[in-house]
Amino acid sequence: MAAMFNHPWPNLTLIYFFFIVVLPFQSLSQFDSPQNIETFFPISSLSPVPPPLLPPSSNPSPPSNNSSSSDKKTITKAVLITAASTLLVAGVFFFCLQRCIIARRRRDRVGPVRVENTLPPYPPPPMTSAAVTTTTLAREGFTRFGGVKGLILDENGLDVLYWRKLQSQRERSGSFRKQIVTGEEEDEKEVIYYKNKKKTEPVTEIPLLRGRSSTSHSVIHNEDHQPPPQVKQSEPTPPPPPPSIAVKQSAPTPSPPPPIKKGSSPSPPPPPPVKKVGALSSSASKPPPAPVRGASGGETSKQVKLKPLHWDKVNPDSDHSMVWDKIDRGSFSFDGDLMEALFGYVAVGKKSPEQGDEKNPKSTQIFILDPRKSQNTAIVLKSLGMTREELVESLIEGNDFVPDTLERLARIAPTKEEQSAILEFDGDTAKLADAETFLFHLLKSVPTAFTRLNAFLFRANYYPEMAHHSKCLQTLDLACKELRSRGLFVKLLEAILKAGNRMNAGTARGNAQAFNLTALLKLSDVKSVDGKTSLLNFVVEEVVRSEGKRCVMNRRSHSLTRSGSSNYNGGNSSLQVMSKEEQEKEYLKLGLPVVGGLSSEFSNVKKAACVDYETVVATCSALAVRAKDAKTVIGECEDGEGGRFVKTMMTFLDSVEEEVKIAKGEERKVMELVKRTTDYYQAGAVTKGKNPLHLFVIVRDFLAMVDKVCLDIMRNMQRRKVGSPISPSSQRNAVKFPVLPPNFMSDRAWSDSGGSDSDM
């Protein structure tokens, strides 16, 4: 009852009801007293004349009836007033009793408060009764502001806000409400639930995220994205509360600002079930369960879904040991948090352990170039192996660069618009990306840096290009000399011409004096009647046989100089003993090395076939144009930057002009020789629009076909030798296969003989 008299309005209410109750009882006592009942009889006249003496019959009957009816009405009124007064007194009694109960519940609600560290930084020791700190806060310890009554507690770095509203329609309605406490960095959230008046559950604090606590200046947000309809927008915001009382610290902690409604705040998960216990101390004695951690560090009870690794599972074999048996007992472990951040499907808000609470520096970088180009430029700059200062010094002094470094720098060269944008940047250069920072300082030091790099690149590429051009001209010159000096190739052309005229006899194609060399590539397409050989095989075999006879004649003429020589007599007798078939085989054996080595004698012709005519002709012109442009650009660098670079490059460009003129003269001579050689084999073949070097391509391909035919002839001879019976005379006069020269099966002829091992 003491809590009820703290407020003045209950006293006034009791006095008011006291007068209401007392006044009816006083009126009731007046009606019940017989002295207050008076009876008046009518008087006919005022004169004191005595009435006549009559017998007492029915005169007193009317007064008795009126008296009885008035008594009944009075009793009825008294009963009704008594009943109403009783009900009113009972209502006042129950109203006072209810107010006392409510006041007692409010004192119990803010009475014993248990402050615990819900998330200890290390595993806690076994709990004892003395280890739990319980602090009872008086009702006056709370600080009131507006309709909110609360207290800020700091639990070893974890800020908890205990608060409740009084005289609120939400509390009177008995419905639960949630409030979200969000820190400045949103690293953790706490959900505080109001309890219903009809229940006695304690306030539950649930940490939603692990980590360090936010500061005490937490902002309270409503959970609902939209305000409830019963709350008016014109409701004034309560002022900020004064500093609250710290429970475990002597210094007061600053109070949070008033609640701020944000529609974009994320909704917290549903609260865990709360045990229904009557006393607050019994429910607060048990701390809330800490979040469960997985076996591999960083894994929570609800694992984040990671990207799958597709493989085939293999069951270990228990019969013998395997490498997988030792893996389970290994000491290797990975960082689960980092793996989730790298390979998790939902990695928003995850921070790698290396970063901690630091902000990602890449998010604050300023990109002037395209982000992808900026990233590629940064990668190339890191791979150069030289600092910005070394690069600037080389550009100013004109030092030589490694060609690979120049090519990399040329690939990342920004356009003129990008260079202007970088130079016009006037902000904090520390916020620029790596590539933009490098380019900014480089262009500030040397505004014509990339112009100089192009000049260096031209100087680095000039000497290799000029050397390649000179080598191509030399190859063409030697190829023309080979085509004019090798008589065996001319002998092959003679055999083909005679065979063609024999086959084309009687037609318009017959009796030809020359033919286009493109027909050489079609000889293998002309097959014999039985399809076993071709015109090319026939012509090459005849030339081989002819060269073999020539070798025999050379031996015979060489032996005549040695008259009386036993070797000659023996050799002559051996040829006379041989049959015609054996002589043919001997001619083939002696002629194959001669014809088969023809392609090796045309080595420069085969090289000339690979020369690009357009490149050879355009090299000198391109070098002259680039030298002229470089001289113009370098002249612009002379004013502001100077250094040894300008003098060195000018000397180089002057020498380039002289060398290019000499190279152009050599080029004209060689191309004239190529034209004469082509006309030597086929007049009028070089026309406008055709490649003047096509002759070398035809000869190269034809020689490759001749080498292949020579290999086929050699294989056929080997098969005949293995299949024919050996006669005594052949045993006595066995002829060994001639020793072939090293260049017999060179180049393509050797590559085309891939199946020779299986046939032999």
UniProtKB/Swiss-Prot annotation:
Keyword annotations for this protein?
Answer: Cell membrane, Membrane, Signal, Transmembrane, Transmembrane helix
Official protein name in the record: Formin-like protein 8
**What Pfam families does the record point to?**
FH2
Q: How does it assemble?
A: Interacts with profilin.
Presence of keyword Transmembrane: yes
Q: Where is the signal peptide?
A: 1-29
Provide the residue span(s) of the region labelled Disordered. 52-71, 204-313
Question: What is the organism of origin for this protein?
Answer: Arabidopsis thaliana
Biased region (Pro residues) positions are 52-63, 253-274
Similarity remark: Belongs to the formin-like family. Class-I subfamily.
Segments crossing the lipid bilayer: 78-98
Subcellular location(s): the record lists:
Cell membrane
Boundaries of every FH2 domain copy: 296-732
Sample GO molecular function, one term? actin filament binding
Regarding the membrane, this protein is recorded as: Single-pass membrane protein
Which gene name belongs to this protein? FH8
